[in-house]
Design a protein with these regions (language model features):
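N-terminal lobe of the biotin/lipoate ligase/transferase fold
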Residues: 2-166, 239
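Long, positively charged amphipathic alpha-helical accessory segments at protein N-termini or as interdomain linkers
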Residues: 2-31, 45-46, 146-149, 155-173, ...
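A short coil-to-beta-strand element that immediately follows conserved catalytic motifs
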Residues: 109, 171-176
Length: 323
């Protein structure tokens, strides 16, 4: 990307849905109109859909499936929660990058990458993070809360992610307790919550989020094709990743504020209604111990109440669940 590409793109984005003249762009950036034209032409080659009309200017109609730092900066400038973001073309893991970036500052921020080469989920399971097909990010938040609140955070943030996906999906989106989001029988999202703590409590929550955005079925590995899906597969319109990210950040901010001010009991019924684990036999894995059973209830502290095949009850704060 050329020296002024991010700046030109930012001006085009800020002026949507209006045209902006090449002269206005040139004056804003203190460059020539010839330089502006070269940048516009290059952005078009990169996949930006820009309508250019004589005596009217340029209109950004659609962005390609690439993350641009200049556009993301617009979200953080208007956000009451996030102070900054870091955007990468490719990275080993957004979670690892977030842990490095939180050292020496007290900011809330997020890391976003177009590709992860070492993406992982809970229990260190591999998470496929292919280029241009998903939203791979880590969110760093700074709540002043006790260690025990981490499981409560999971419950609130799951609803935020679910709500963002539901906005774009024609089919019902459900939460699979505690860390997965499904559309129908396909997993569309997994998230991983970790914390950095000191003697006084939680210093930072780092929530890694992986959402399949635009994959077609053939893009998934054959071994998971029967149980994976993407948002695009349930959206009749072409999915705009920037609109999706904006909605996701709004929902995260909303649910994070609820997490800080509400008890889980106040959203318990909503969470139960949004869950897909009821009235079915499930395989539970807890601390390397496996058993089959049914989820009976979610108590007011967010623990899952399970009855196994022998009739014994279990109260789980975290476990891996397979259908």
């Amino acid at each position: 990307m050329s020296k002024y590409s991010q700046d030109v793109l930012q001006l085009l984005y800020k002026n949507k849905p209006n045209y902006i003249s090449g002269q206005s762009i040139a004056e804003s950036l203190n460059i020539s109109r010839t330089a502006v034209k070269k940048v516009i032409d290059q952005l078009k080659l990169e996949g930006c859909k820009i309508d250019s009309v004589n005596h009217k200017g340029h209109l950004l109609q659609q962005l390609p499936d690439i993350w641009y730092q200049g556009i993301i900066d617009q979200y953080t400038k208007s956000s009451a929660l996030f102070d900054f973001s870091e955007v990468y073309d490719s990275i080993d893991s957004t979670q690892l990058a977030a842990k490095k970036s939180l050292v020496g500052n007290q900011s809330s921020f997020f890391i976003l990458s177009d590709e992860q080469t070492k993406g992982r989920g809970r229990f260190n399971k591999h998470w496929s993070s292919s280029k241009g097909q998903g939203l791979w990010m880590s969110v760093v938040l700074r709540p002043n809360v006790a260690f025990s609140m981490i499981s409560k955070f999971n419950l609130f943030i799951a609803l935020g992610i679910r709500d963002a996906i539901q906005h774009f999906s024609q089919d019902e989106v459900k939460v699979k307790w505690p860390n997965d989001i499904y559309i129908d029988n396909g997993k569309v999202c997994g998230f991983l919550t970790e914390m950095v703590a000191n003697n006084d409590g939680i210093e930072a929550i780092i929530c890694g989020i992986g959402i399949n955005l635009t994959q077609q079925l053939e893009n998934f590995d054959e071994s998971i094709r029967h149980r994976a899906t993407s948002v695009q597969l349930h959206d009749k319109n072409k999915l705009d990743r920037y609109q999706f990210l904006e909605r996701l950040l709004q929902e995260i901010e909303k649910r994070y504020n609820q997490f800080l001010t509400l008890s889980f009991s106040e959203i318990r019924e909503e969470y139960i209604a949004a869950s897909n684990i009821w009235n079915r036999t499930l395989l539970f894995t807890e601390n390397d111990k496996q058993f089959k059973g049914q989820a009976i209830d979610l108590d007011y502290d967010g623990y899952l109440i399970v009855r196994d095949e022998a009739g014994e009850s279990h109260r789980l704060i975290s476990a891996d669940i397979d259908f």
